[in-house]
Amino acid sequence: MKKLVKSAVVFAGLVFIGTSATMITEKASAASTDPVQKVDGQATYIPKGVRDGTATEEHDGFEDGTNSVLQQVPLLRATTGYPDVNAYIKSNKFSTAKIEKQLKSQFPKFNYRNGYGKPEGIVIHETANNSSTITGEINYMSTNYNNAFVHAFVDKSRIIQIHPTENGVWGAGQYANARFIQVELVRSKTFDEFARSINNYAYYAAYLLDQYNLPVDSAHSDGKGTVWSHDAVTRYLGGTTHTDPVAYFNQWGYNFNNFVSLINEKYKAMQVNYEKIEYDKAITAYSRVKTATGNSVWTKPNKTEGAKLVNPLSSYSGKNLRIIREAKTSGGTIWYQFSVGGKTIGWVDSKALNTFYTPSMEKTITGTRYVLPSKQTVHYYGLPVEDSAIDRGPLSKFNGQALTLQREATIEGQLWYRVKDLGWVKAVNLTTTKYDLIEYDKAITAYSRVKTAAGNYVWSKPNKTEGAKQGSALSTYSGKNMRIIREAKTSSGTIWYQFSIDGKTIGWVDTKALNTFYTPSMEKNLTATRYVAPGQETQHYYGLPVADSAIDRGPLSKFAGQTLTVQREATIEGQLWYRVKDLGWTKASTLTATQYDKLEYDKAITAYSRVKTATGNSVWTKPYRTSGYKLVNPLSSYAGKNLRIIREAKTSSGIWYQFSVGGKTIGWVDSKALNTFYTPSMEKTITGTRYVLPSKQTVHYYGLPVEDSAIDRGPLSKFNGQALTLQREATIEGQLWYRVKDLGWVKAANLTTTKYDTLSYDKAITAYSRVKTATGNSVWTKPNKIEGAQKISALSTYSGKNMRILREAKTSSGTIWYQFSVGGKTIGWVETKALNTFYTPSMEKNLTATRYVLTSKKNEHYYGLPVVDSAIDRGPLSKFSGKTLTVQREATIEGQLWYRVKDLGWTKAANLSAKKQ
């Protein structure tokens, strides 16, 4: 399709007639107002790209290969030096290409202006692209079809149809698009290729005209006919400006009249005499489409006189075609006339169908059957095919009747029976068993329990009805509340109940096996006001007056304190139930006519309080004026005690505390009567490390910062010397407490930041020492690094003195300490390594001897221990002059022998004599 020409040609005989661009425009304009051009829904025939403004007819991407202006060309054959094309074709006896189909599903489908399958002719195009190929053109058009597309492409060796010719295309402007089949010719590079392509083109054009019973009539010169050049469309119809294929034909010494002449020759060769009908008879059969491609439906057998196209056979794919007549034509083809849904459609080649029913498939049988109750709505038919045209109605008319079988037929693997005086029905809809029928099946509401389990079962459907299967023994459900959801009566007169348990449908049971304890008929109207009884808030209400989890609507706590309107009552198994408006059913015992204080909340808390105002306050089992509250004691009974607050509740009269004492829960008291000295809000987060003060090992720690035996966790001694991690602190009544990780609460005064040594042991001993190393050593009030140890003096103060050792202690650091006295006065503690011990009792030995005080030594003294120490000086020996002294022990102290005399003490051996003086 060339661009808008500035001159064009009209062929008439051998005369050349030039037409200016102005004339073409005028004719096109005139054509556009011709009533014959007006088509309903004309926009359908305009390419989408043009409608959207993304393309124009002049610039649609197709046939835009040259901008050259066409020159005047001769009507018949230009003197180009090429042979006569038509003669060349005949002399070479070219064959024609096979018609290929590559239909593009993405192309839009729309009918011609006169309807589906009713083209009025054909438009001859050429591609205007010297370098393209037939596949390249098709591929490009397949992507850009919104700008333009045609029915087929032709080249030297192929004819490829890409769109059904029964539908229109977008190839030559809206007026041609509404009327014509359109075919593109791919350009050739040699004369021989051109001639071969023209041969294929003319054949295909003739084939299409013959297919649609259209004559060969050129519209090139007068705008009337069935064979149109694109150029003629421009000049006579409008809606386009292209002029192909005139210039391209002229390039090879060819013109449009030559082409129409070749079409006419091929068209005539296709014409044949009408076939005759050898027979035409009524038959009965059913078929479906087997091969839709290439087959159509005709008003009469095709190629017989008067045969016209009805529809492509594909229109009836998947449908049951009732074959009503069979005809054979002189060409040997057998044709079937068929109807669909009772309406006669037309004739089709029998080879295009698959026949699935003929009367020859039937066999004679005898037998009796009954309609399956579940198949009452299934229909029966005049023939063994589901076809609305022979539908005789539902099987329900014959419920319970004995049906006499006469014939059977297996149609597509499915067995059908013909019933006497009835018709055909699928065998699966009938049964040899006469089942009970359901006379009624209705929803009801009731509750029952098993009365007679023996011999009774649960069924999937009422027993003896179609499909009923035995389930478990009824005894499985003994003692359970069975909600009755449906009631059915069978034709045998038995009434059956369908029941559920806990919301799950179980099955059907004979009503005689049950005892029904609730039906709606037991209910009575009632008008009353009630309140949820305190203490009953956890009781539930239900959809019906039965405690069944499947209809449980939740606890009554949602309605505590609300005024409830009672509408109905029912006594179920001796127990009165109320139905509350907008609520449901609950036992009457859960409600009360008295309105108590309502608990707005009741929550666990942690606190400690003491009695602030005992006068006029009491302790109650529940918050005062709530349901079930009773007096426990006057509050004064707990004055001065630590009350642990464990719950807080709010009523319309105030806030109440529940408390315990010594771990025992006591009751509830008005919070205003107490002074709260601890709540968790008093706590603060801290970090730090502490150690147990050794002197506080017996002190206890607690679960909270309060000294309460109920939360006493034991003595701190378990944690001596351990680093304790602080987490929180609280000042309770002026006293600081610490919470220790993994431990609990302890008063801060029991801990220290210093890690003291602890005493491994501390025992009384007897010894005497003197200072060995004074330098760097001191005397302490306690062993150094023990809690409370204070320095007294330098050890050098006591150098040279006899230090009586009173006690020995060992600390956790491994050091051994001595507590000593000098002159009978206790001084302090000193590390043992700083001393030289010259006496210990271990130095003593037993001895038995008699001695006498030497006269010269009667003024010497004796001592409590073998050491000269004024603190243990017992006096002069003169008291015992002349007396016999019994020696019991001896000890050598610093090289000097001492004797211990019975009932006397120690004295140096030198003071005594073995002989009496």
Curated annotation (Swiss-Prot):
It is found in: Cell surface; Cell membrane. Pfam families: Amidase_2, GW. Residues 118-245 form the N-acetylmuramoyl-L-alanine amidase domain. InterPro entries: Amidase/PGRP_sf, Amidase_domain, Glycosyl_Hydrolase_73, GW_dom, GW_dom_sf. SUPFAM superfamilies: N-acetylmuramoyl-L-alanine amidase-like, Prokaryotic SH3-related domain. GO terms for cellular component: cell surface; plasma membrane. Residues 262-917 are annotated as: GW repeat region, necessary and sufficient for cell surface attachment. GO terms for biological process: adhesion of symbiont to host epithelial cell; cell wall organization; peptidoglycan catabolic process. Disruption phenotype: Decrease in lytic activity on L.monocytogenes and S.aureus. Decreased adhesion to mammalian host cells, however no change in host invasion and host intracellular growth. Residues 1-30 form the signal peptide. Its EC number is 3.2.1.-. Keywords: Cell membrane, Cell wall biogenesis/degradation, Hydrolase, Membrane, Repeat, Signal. GO terms for molecular function: N-acetylmuramoyl-L-alanine amidase activity. A bacteriolysin able to lyse both L.monocytogenes and S.aureus. The C-terminus has 8 GW repeats. In the N-terminal section; belongs to the N-acetylmuramoyl-L-alanine amidase 2 family. NCBIfam families: GW_glycos_SH3 (NF033202). This is Protein Ami.
